[in-house]
Regions:
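Structural beta-strand/beta-sheet cores of well-ordered domains, especially the beta-sheet scaffolds
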Residues: 12-14, 22, 35, 62, ...
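Short loop segments at secondary-structure junctions
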Residues: 21-23, 30, 90-94, 112-114
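Active-site-adjacent beta-strand/loop module that shapes the phosphate/pyrophosphate-binding cleft
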Residues: 75-98
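Nudix hydrolase/Nudix homology domain
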Residues: 33-37, 100-145
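Active-site proximal loops enriched in glycine and acidic residues that flank catalytic Cys/His/Asp
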Residues: 28-29, 39-41, 66-75, 91, ...
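Extended interfacial segments that mediate partner engagement and assembly in macromolecular machines
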Residues: 7-51
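Short, small-residue-biased leader/transition segments that mark boundaries at the very start
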Residues: 2-6
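The catalytic Nudix box helix
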Residues: 39-73, 87
């Protein structure tokens, strides 16, 4: 007899820190009550990997190509059924932003020392911004590499 498996629905989403040497891309959402700077973000679509989601969301929201996509960590979002997965990636080519005005009000590059931060916010986005600002985005290497 086959067992029935009942699970809660979980929606995978990515938070993306796009970096270009000493700069990180930050944005403000369009049409939302939250008006502070954040990283790019979006939901995975059926049939794509989260790495493909990273590249697609960056292209859709700001028109940039990225490379060297690397996982940072995840966080369940308590206000919804979303599992946030944080990634850093590097700019691949031209840094000229083509903004999707339906999604974003603004997107701009910030030098590490000029990054606006909110130390009190307990979120994956804020943690990733602080990690980059404090120069801690390198992937940990195993001994012998």
């Amino acid at each position: 007899q086959r067992q029935m498996c009942i699970r809660d629905r979980i929606c995978p989403a990515v938070i993306v820190g796009v970096t270009d040497h000493n700069r990180i891309l930050m944005s403000k959402y369009a049409g939302r009550t939250y008006k502070k700077y954040a990283l790019l973000a979006g939901f995975s679509e059926i049939g794509e990997t989260v790495e493909q989601t990273v590249a697609r969301e960056v292209m859709e929201e700001v028109g940039l190509k990225v490379k060297n996509i690397r996982y940072y960590k995840s966080q369940p979002w308590a206000f919804s059924d979303t599992l946030l997965m944080g990634f850093y990636c590097d700019l691949d080519g031209n840094d000229a932003i083509t903004l999707d005005r339906e999604e974003l009000a603004v997107a701009e590059w910030f030098e590490r020392e000029d990054i606006p931060v909110e130390p009190s916010r307990d979120s994956l986005t804020n943690e990733m911004i602080l990690q980059f600002k404090n120069e801690r985005t390198a992937v940990k290497k195993e001994k012998g590499e």
